[in-house]
């Protein structure tokens, strides 16, 4: 088992990574002992892992209950958030309760936001079950729900007390979901770690085969990078914004196509290629860098082009609502090479239109 610490002074917490962690009562004991616990999961994950996790938690917790939500980005809304609050209130959960997110990024975001809001803040644990949530969304305290006019527009920064990543979950993860998670892995290589990027190029087959050593290595490295960035810039005033590479374009794709039709990682993959194309257009990188990025994304069966139905106007209406917009200026995360990126506002509408039109 690997352990990584997210260093945030009195709000620091550990990330545990390895196989067979769902049975490890000692991992959960410091957070749940003697507490009432509500496990939040979805209709896909609950039949696979809810009983196992509930049994482990019950060994130390005073009581364990659960609420099961529908599975999908389209259910990441205030209406379904209220189902968590209903379960907490109807069950008379007090301020010393613990919420547990058992699922992917949607469940993690919603559970974390519920924990941030319920009685002005209760403890929660992240148990991410998808590759995307294991390498990205479960770490760092971003919590939110979507609004019809924009993704993650209603949320809070609120850190978990513990993250437990059991890699055995990946054995039940559909191939499309695994690929979507690899988009976020590739992102880390582009923005911060050229050695990771090269390692990914050399280990595509091992990762697709779920080789245990390869999987643990890549999850741990991504969590290390995320922990470093979050420790330096928790509320995204500076370097943390780089973690949004591909996300401004990607969120526009998700919103325009309807949440759930394109997976988040698929949209981010296409968005990273668009960001790299923008860097080429602005003279920030050579086209060979764009080709490496696109080739690695394609190697994991991810899209490298935006939907044909989307033109400049359908992108820009969503991009203008991006959380990185400052003073009315659109700001994009753009690669400066493999292992480096910057937040830039230098791309004009004409240049973006050229990038979006490009086949």
Curated annotation (Swiss-Prot):
Keywords: Amino-acid biosynthesis, Aromatic amino acid biosynthesis, Cobalt, Cytoplasm, Lyase, Metal-binding, NAD, Nucleotide-binding, Zinc. It is an enzyme of class 4 (lyase). Binds 1 divalent metal cation per subunit. Can use either Co(2+) or Zn(2+). Disulfide bonds: none annotated. It catalyses: 7-phospho-2-dehydro-3-deoxy-D-arabino-heptonate = 3-dehydroquinate + phosphate. One of its GO terms (cellular component) is cytoplasm. Pathway: Metabolic intermediate biosynthesis; chorismate biosynthesis; chorismate from D-erythrose 4-phosphate and phosphoenolpyruvate: step 2/7. The keyword Oxidoreductase does not apply. Its cofactor is Co(2+); Zn(2+); NAD(+). Its main location: cytoplasm. GO terms for molecular function: 3-dehydroquinate synthase activity; metal ion binding; nucleotide binding. CDD domains: DHQS. It is found in: Cytoplasm. NAD(+) binds at residues 71-76, 105-109, 129-130, 142, 151, 169-172. The keyword DNA repair does not apply. Pfam families: DHQ_synthase (PF01761), DHQS_C (PF24621). One of its GO terms (biological process) is amino acid biosynthetic process. Zn(2+) binds at residues 184, 247, 264. Its EC number is 4.2.3.4. SUPFAM superfamilies: Dehydroquinate synthase-like (SSF56796). Catalyzes the conversion of 3-deoxy-D-arabino-heptulosonate 7-phosphate (DAHP) to dehydroquinate (DHQ). Belongs to the sugar phosphate cyclases superfamily. Dehydroquinate synthase family. HAMAP family: DHQ_synthase. This is 3-dehydroquinate synthase. It comes from Shewanella amazonensis (strain ATCC BAA-1098 / SB2B).
């Amino acid at each position: 088992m690997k352990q990584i610490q997210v260093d945030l002074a009195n709000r620091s917490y550990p990330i545990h990574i390895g196989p067979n962690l769902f049975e490890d009562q000692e991992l959960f004991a410091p957070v749940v002992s003697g507490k009432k616990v509500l496990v939040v999961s979805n209709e896909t994950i609950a039949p696979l892992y809810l009983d196992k996790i509930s049994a482990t938690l019950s060994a130390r917790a005073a009581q364990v209950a659960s609420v099961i939500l529908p599975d999908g980005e389209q259910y990441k809304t205030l209406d379904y958030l209220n189902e968590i609050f209903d379960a907490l209130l109807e069950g008379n959960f007090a301020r010393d309760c613990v919420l547990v997110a058992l699922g992917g990024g949607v469940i993690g975001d919603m559970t974390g936001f519920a924990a941030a809001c319920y009685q002005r803040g209760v403890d929660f644990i992240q148990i991410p079950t998808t590759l995307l949530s294991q390498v990205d969304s479960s770490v760092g305290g971003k919590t939110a729900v979507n609004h019809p006019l924009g993704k993650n527009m209603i949320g809070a920064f609120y850190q978990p007390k513990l993250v437990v990543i059991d890699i055995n979950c990946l054995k039940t993860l559909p191939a499309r979901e695994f690929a979507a998670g690899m988009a976020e892995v590739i992102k880390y290589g582009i923005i911060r770690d050229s050695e990771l990027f090269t390692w990914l190029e050399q280990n595509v087959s091992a990762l697709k085969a779920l080789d245990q050593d390869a999987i643990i290595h890549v999850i741990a490295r991504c969590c290390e990078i995320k922990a470093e960035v979050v420790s330096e810039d928790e509320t995204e005033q500076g370097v943390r914004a780089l973690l949004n590479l591909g996300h401004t374009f990607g969120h526009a794709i998700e919103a325009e196509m309807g949440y759930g039709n394109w997976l988040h990682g698929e949209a981010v993959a296409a968005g990273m290629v668009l960001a790299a194309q923008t860097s080429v257009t602005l003279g920030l990188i050579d086209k060979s860098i764009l080709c490496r990025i696109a080739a690695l994304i394609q190697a994991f069966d991810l899209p490298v082009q935006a939907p044909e139905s989307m033109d400049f106007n359908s992108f820009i209406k969503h991009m203008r609502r991006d959380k990185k917009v400052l003073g009315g200026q659109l700001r994009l995360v753009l690669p400066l090479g493999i292992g480096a990126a910057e937040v830039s506002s230098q791309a004009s509408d004409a240049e973006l239109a050229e990038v979006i039109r490009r086949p």
